Curated annotation (Swiss-Prot):
This is Maturase K. Its main location: plastid. Signal peptide: none annotated. Belongs to the intron maturase 2 family. MatK subfamily. It comes from Kniphofia uvaria. The lineage of its organism: Eukaryota, Viridiplantae, Streptophyta, Embryophyta, Tracheophyta. GO terms for biological process: mRNA processing; RNA splicing; tRNA processing. Usually encoded in the trnK tRNA gene intron. Probably assists in splicing its own and other chloroplast group II introns. Keywords: Chloroplast, mRNA processing, Plastid, RNA-binding, tRNA processing. GO terms for molecular function: RNA binding. HAMAP family: MatK. One of its GO terms (cellular component) is chloroplast. It is found in: Plastid, Chloroplast. PANTHER family: MATURASE K (PTHR34811:SF1).
Length: 521
């Protein structure tokens, strides 16, 4: 880490980012290896075939040795039969090396982004910790804004069809041309090489979960390009003239040219297309929120305005990124009768009507008031589907045992199930109807009991009778304990005592597979 920090300081002083020499540094691969593989709320850290932490240093050394060998990255295999192509050990090493190299690429590419972020904080004199926003901070924002809006567009941002699009978007911010060529070569070769290991029905290897880090980096660069022009037009809408011939600016030198051009001549892209859509951004009641591929665009305008926005996004992806996006990816609905799925919640607006009796002297009259309330509920069906995928229950929600954990100790089994249950309750603490979570807790509790009974070769009823209430105590969440401190005058909290309280835990800075809409679709 110290050597990496020295390199970052050196790169900051030179203002040039030569990244390709880092590919031959052993500590980069050690950092990628120590970073760990993917984990989620349901799955333990992914274990590659017979992977053992004790052999990590040997594997990293072996990887470096193979990297130094000539033509290692450009070796190709013509045999498409996996059994003939790779034995057990060969598949283990190739799978491991592919993952760790992709992780190393991601770590290296993140360097210029981290430098720019740190310099931005130093220039603006903003403490870094002020930028650490909770994911749950989105929902208080929606609570205050959506109640005054009419329509919402549910947008699913498409993946680029060709990886060259991802490399070109990254080229705007990474100035090391040899490294970009090597990255392009790496993506091309590894896509062809790993395509032999997957069926045609599965997604390409590069977009699989095993390469989540580098995929997230490149995809976020692509999404940033999608949103960059939208944010620019929104901020500058009141400064732009209605008639203009415009000037095309190269995105590679965007930040340098913006300092020398007056704002009235600053029109970023195609004058044949974007000058027709600038008036969209003059609507002050337009709100845009995104997480990963899912975006929400809400407006106080009419259905016609939202329809214009829909085709604006479709044309933007087509002309700027050169790929076709199907219009059905964007759904337009009225907020009063529509529930949209976002960040693991089903959100909607509830209309509350109330009558107030007002009396002035001898006259009295009733005043009917209608207020909108932002409502969030737990998507039980989607949670059960994720539990079924993780082998905790059947598709219908019937709890089953977890045989893969039967070899663990009783305390480890209870701790794993309890941790999953507490994390779920922690994340969905902002739900307005927490009774739905009790079914999920019941599934996990009974699945834990079935796993323990399977381990001890006993029935669930006999095991629960012997264990008593100790198993239930492991599934009490921290939420009841926090609420008992906040509201001490209330009656003691039980398992069902806090279903009316909505609390957004602002210490949540990462989420799990449950909130990823693609994993639940």
């Amino acid at each position: 880490m110290e050597e990496l920090q020295r390199y970052l300081e050196k790169g900051r002083s030179r203002q040039q980012h030569f990244l390709y020499p880092l590919l031959f540094q052993e500590y980069i691969y050690a950092l990628a290896h120590d970073h760990g593989l993917n984990s989620s709320i349901f799955y333990e850290p992914v274990e590659i075939i017979s992977y053992d932490n004790k052999s990590s240093l040997a594997l990293v050394k072996r990887l470096i040795t193979r990297i130094y060998q000539q033509n290692y990255l450009i070796s190709s295999v013509n045999d498409s039969n996996q059994n003939q192509f790779l034995g057990h050990n060969a598949f283990f090493y190739s799978h491991f090396f592919s993952q760790i190299i992709s992780e190393s690429f991601a770590i290296i590419v993140e360097i210029p982004f981290s430098l720019r972020l740190v310099s931005f904080f130093e220039e603006k004199e903003i403490p870094i910790y002020h930028n650490l926003r909770s994911i749950h901070s989105i929902f208080p924002f929606l609570e205050g804004k959506l109640s005054h809006l009419n329509y919402v567009s549910d947008i699913l941002i498409p993946h680029p069809i060709h990886m060259e699009i991802l490399v070109q978007t990254l080229q705007c911010r990474v100035q090391d041309v040899p490294f970009l060529h090597l990255l392009r070569f790496f993506l091309h070769e590894y896509h062809n090489w790993n395509s032999l290991l997957i069926t045609q029905n599965k997604s390409i290897y590069f977009f699989s979960k095993e390469n989540k880090r580098i995929f997230r980096l490149l995809y976020n660069s692509y999404v940033f390009e999608c949103e960059f022009l939208l944010v620019f037009f929104r901020k500058q809408s009141y400064y732009l003239r209605l008639t203009s011939s415009g000037t095309f600016l190269e995105r590679t030198h965007f930040y340098r040219k913006i300092e020398h051009l007056p704002i009235e001549h600053f029109f970023v892209v195609c004058r044949n297309y974007f000058h027709r859509t600038r008036w969209f951004f003059k609507n002050p009641f337009m709100h845009y929120v995104r997480y990963q591929r899912k975006a929400i665009l809400a407006s106080r305008g009419t259905h016609f305005l939202m329809k214009k926005w829909k085709y604006h996004f479709v044309n933007f992806w087509q002309y700027y990124f050169h790929f076709w996006s199907r219009p059905y990816r964007i759904h337009i609905n009225h907020l009063s009768n529509y529930s949209f799925y976002f960040l693991g919640y089903l959100s909607s607006l509830l209309i509350n009507s109330s009558a107030v009796r007002n009396q002035m002297l001898e006259n009295s009259f009733l005043i009917d008031t209608v207020t909108n309330k932002f409502d969030t509920i737990v998507p039980v069906i989607l949670l059960i589907r994720s539990l079924s995928k993780a082998k905790f229950c059947t598709v219908s929600g019937h709890p089953i045992s977890k045989p893969i954990w039967a070899d663990l100790s009783d305390s480890d089994i209870i701790d794993r199930f309890g941790r999953i249950c507490r994390n779920l309750s922690h994340y969905h603490s902002g739900s307005s109807k927490k009774q739905d979570l009790y079914r999920i807790k019941y599934i996990l509790r009974l699945s834990c009991a079935r796993t323990l009974a399977r381990k001890h070769k006993s029935t669930v009823r006999t095991f629960l009778r012997r264990l008593g209430s100790g198993l239930l105590e492991e599934f009490f969440t921290e939420e009841e304990q926090v609420l008992s401190l906040i509201f001490p005058k209330r009656t003691p909290f039980t398992l069902h005592g806090s279903h009316r309280e909505r609390i957004w835990y602002l210490d949540i800075i990462c989420i799990n597979d449950l909130v990823n809409h693609s994993x639940l679709s």
